[in-house]
């Protein structure tokens, strides 16, 4: 009954917080409690529970450690076990369940339960009961049910049981206990929770110390109705609110329940909550079952300390008093180890409640951890979309409650992950993004999304796809994109003028008066025109198929063909977010969208037609709106046609520095123009399709154009400039591979290639700046090593090098050697005269070994020298990383060698030192006997001594072992310091003392560079007696090991001295005291409150020495000239025996020649006459014969000495191993260099070779086949130990070698430019003549044709002239290219071979015959081709021999075009013999109509020049009256034509196959070249031109479009006029019969 009554008590008494009255609340009935519990049941995520259940089944193992789930991973295959499918109608396995989990198909745990039940029932139905599968199914099903019940039905029953336990045990400790005793118990329980850690040392209670922020976690307070934390519990303990342990247990239960309700099962917080609850009840049981008889002081100290940790320093200070209690000290030390783990709770208590914290949240900014998310609110509104998108990514958690974005908070460590910064060129982290948000650097959400995507792409690029980081990236990208769409939809709702939802919105808002708003309003109007367009009759919206891009799943090929997809959604989004800098940007995107539709879909399809109609409507509407008021560019139609349209919409205002550089490179190549203003990049913008040029894709395996490069650039696929340059170089290489060396496109590719490299060089600056300066690095390493050794100190702070300063500079055993001391070495180091580590080591060891030779083994100098040598070796190995950084011969001398040398040296010196000590002791003994004899004689005279241990003088007692001041011999000296060893009184009653005298530093002989401890004195070898009356006072001398830690009582600091060494006046040397043997003093020593710092001061002679240095400055100035040269290591000639050597030759491995040391394996520059750069030779043999030195070895050549394509790129300073191996005299050597393999070039350098003389070689050049092939490496040599090896420095990070263009590139460009300049020069002469007489003759007027002709503007390719003018032929012959084709010889060969092939294959078409003729020409021998070329020499240039009668139209493509109004060429008079009636080629006037072709991709118009045949004997009229003999004069006055055509430019053949393509268009059954019947049937309204076709129209023929609407209309009008004039000529000159 009592138990039930306790359960009926309201729980509000422990959770409401109202405990001040000290009474229990009124009880409430039981049902209300149950209703409250039901309302607060945990809201568990079913998907998380399903994952936990699946993982439990998957990870369960039996007693043998086998996974039981392996039997059910996959269902049996129907082929192997067909009977399984007879028994089981619905097969399922764990793989299917896992797939459903990934697809989140389980919305409820019951669905997963049904699948698992089906899985195990299938197994039980098929397998026998004694089979392993059947037993495993039973076990796993039982495990599944138990686990499911724990997750789903965990809430009420467990809490009820816990409450019963707590209530039953409530009275065990509370009854009869005082409030103070209960408080101590509660504090112990709280302490157990607060200090509990997991095995890794993490505090379990960390997340439970404070409630989560209401700002950052508002949903927590919506779910949790009774929030509580450890801070609240600590306050209630301090306030005495808990009347029993059960009351605190209720709050702990509530704390755990809240955590498990809000967090997912399996999360870390969920587990920590269970741990806290378990710890509490374990501690509670421990207290209940043990007698509470421990020391109250210990309990109080421990428990109050825990409470003080939680509640701040203001509570229970008395319990932590200053008394030295061991128990208190124990707990204080225990807490000191824990540090400040509970500082967060203490801070929370000091600064008030949670609401106060939220109010002050704007001032709190934390850089790391969870607090970082809160700091965003201090500078940004929570409703800000930027903050929402950032916070969504940053605070996203997985099912275990872990922050998914945690690895992205900061960038990886450069020390731990150096390769990350090699692969990732633009690293970025959430912290950097947060900083940009804080500084408001993001203009739009797209900019923020761009940075987040960059961060994710970096992670995906660095990590493997199966890694955990990679999976986190995918999840975060999904979350980010979903949030971005949500924010976009929210903008749609907030934006009242959404263009898609309300397409008919008012376009004339009077509120938007600014220029920006007017521009945006115009874009909306144009957008709405496309949006509202409908098909007449059906009412179908034409834009429906353009709203969103096609699905990648349904149309995968679309994204292979269309590199830059675009849809109306994107355009609308860009308009709304002001991404377009102007109206042109939106128009470019619209045109791109329509162009994509026409490119992907077939002509005549619905989408194709809709794109054309919508584009026309858009242009018409834009024309209707007119130009912007302040847009001056719209005034001139000519300017509008010629200028670049708009700013690229993809070029955002916000670009990273790398994106800006990439854009600059791209724009530099794209916008480059030649001297005539022609843009060279036009033909490289887009490749022809496979249907247009199939053979291109057969020849070129990796096609590339500038549109693809631009799309890669906009998609952030280029991590650095080199990646983009590689694609550009590939594109130019493709152009040079496919096209002829004489073609214009070949020349344009070379020029743009040069522009590309120049632009990259300008952007990146000095390309070699990233190569480390090895000389400086070696000197820095030597400097660091020297400073480390010279500043090496012992435990007392004494520098070991101080004692070595007294070493003489010259070794007495070798007086002829140059002097060498540490001071000289220091000057060499400061002057950077060491280039080798082994030389520096030799000098250092020479000084140290001299110190060892000249001093005893037990002396301080000897020991310091050994210590410094050991320290040198250790620091040297650390700096060189045992050869990983610097590989030097110096590393061969190790500590083991040093120990052997020292031991050997000691064995030699110790016998001598023992003999010296013996002699010294005998001498001291004799001196002592003499002194005793003298004192004995004095004693016989009547003096008698009475010895004592102490004596008094002037009211002071002096004891043996005391230190005293003794009156100095001279008045101006300091008192002497003496240690009393004996005291006596003579017979006269006078008191005496005898002892050891201590010297101050100024009383010793030492170098001015020596430093001393403050208050240091030295124990001397001088002992003497002094009358006690000479004592001036007491002092204390302490040993160095005690001086800094202890201090004497009742002594002033100035009377306390420190002694570290003894001083010998005979040898004037110092030696450290190892054992303090002075008499025991009666002075008492106590520990110092603060240990004294070890401070060393300079000698008193240092100032005087400075004066001497100043006097010697003049002498040092004289020696400065010596500092300019480098110190060289001593070397010697190393002869070697050569078994197969020639007689009279003396061979060497190392030889000195002209002050240059050379060894086998070295590379040298050798004199090379007639070359730009000297060649490089490698020494493989060295010999001297008759006093002259020679070497033999292979020769390396430079790229300009090889044959290669001009577009080939080489590494800077790259050379090639040739087939040449020569013997050269040493006199031809210009200097040393180093040729490294590719691997070594990236990673290391020899230290004595300048960087400019370091060369790279990875390929061998074969002269016979002109091929470059990589080889393994150069031959290595094994030399004797006398040969000095090179020191090699290895870079910490491999360098990236830069490439440079071929040296032939510039020469080839200059040659082609000169050739084309000569061709264009001929045109200029004709143009000048044409300008003088530009009038043309008007033919008789005839009625205009009513039926317009359709020209084939987009079908007929341009075939430029084939013949080379005389002025250019000379240079063309010099250019020996294997791909050069002389088309005149080919024409002659074709005229002969065509008849032969025609006879063999009468059924072949004209195009097939032409292909066979071309194949035969390619396979023809060179000699035969030369014969045809010679045969063509007899014909006039440009005219093929005709084999038969000519009928119809004859192509004059091989002739030079002539400017209208200009005279005919001198080699073609108006009547050419053999070609009756053919007018001069190239005449373009109203009498001759050229056949218009497709303009070149470069933008220049081109056409196939044709003439019209007249009757035999009749000549065509000249273009203007002149002194030409042919033809009757024309009396009519010429009039100015309506359209004036500019002179056609001479252009080279772009592709050799273009000629064949033209021939294929001919037909044997037709009497004409063009399809004139189709041309006459074409009408303007029936022909729809695409944007590409319009761009290729020869619009520059006309000055302006005149009165016509578009330029196309004007050209249609020109076509009608030309057809009419053609008919007029035909009728006027009676050409009907031709």
From Swiss-Prot:
Residues 1379-1447 bind DNA. The modification Phosphotyrosine is found at residues 134, 1289. Residues 901-933 have a biased composition (Basic and acidic residues). Residues 499-508 have a biased composition (Polar residues). One of its GO terms (biological process) is heart morphogenesis. Keywords: Acetylation, Bromodomain, Chromatin regulator, DNA-binding, Isopeptide bond, Nucleus, Phosphoprotein, Repeat, Transcription, Transcription regulation, Tumor suppressor, Ubl conjugation. The keyword RNA-binding does not apply. The modification Phosphoserine is found at residues 10, 39, 131, 178, 319, 353, 355, 371, 375, 498, 509, 636, 648, 689, 948, 987, 1405. Residues 956-1074, 1156-1272 form the BAH domain. There is a cross-link at residue 1293 (Glycyl lysine isopeptide (Lys-Gly) (interchain with G-Cter in SUMO1)). Residues 1-39, 155-179, 487-517, 625-653, 901-942, 1106-1129, 1354-1378 are annotated as: Disordered. It is found in: Nucleus. Residues 157-167 have a biased composition (Acidic residues). It holds the Pfam family BAH. Residues 41-151, 177-287, 381-487, 518-625, 653-763, 769-879 form the Bromo domain. InterPro entries: BAH_dom, BAH_sf, Bromodomain, Bromodomain-like_sf, Bromodomain_CS, HMG_box_dom, HMG_box_dom_sf, PBRM1_BD5. The keyword DNA damage does not apply. Its main location: nucleus. GO terms for molecular function: chromatin binding; DNA binding. The modification N6-acetyllysine is found at residue 414. GO terms for cellular component: chromatin; kinetochore; nuclear matrix; nucleus; RSC-type complex. There is a cross-link at residues 96, 154, 210, 425, 471, 511, 591, 638, 653, 1106, 1111, 1167, 1293, 1308, 1398, 1587, 1599, 1601 (Glycyl lysine isopeptide (Lys-Gly) (interchain with G-Cter in SUMO2)). Component of the SWI/SNF-B (PBAF) chromatin remodeling complex, at least composed of SMARCA4/BRG1, SMARCB1/BAF47/SNF5, ACTL6A/BAF53A or ACTL6B/BAF53B, SMARCE1/BAF57, SMARCD1/BAF60A, SMARCD2/BAF60B, perhaps SMARCD3/BAF60C, SMARCC1/BAF155, SMARCC2/BAF170, PBRM1/BAF180, ARID2/BAF200 and actin. Interacts with PHF10/BAF45A. Interacts with acetylated 'Lys-14' of histone H3 (H3K14ac), and may also interact with other acetylated or methylated Lys residues on histone H3. Involved in transcriptional activation and repression of select genes by chromatin remodeling (alteration of DNA-nucleosome topology). Required for the stability of the SWI/SNF chromatin remodeling complex SWI/SNF-B (PBAF). Acts as a negative regulator of cell proliferation. This is Protein polybromo-1. It comes from Mus musculus.
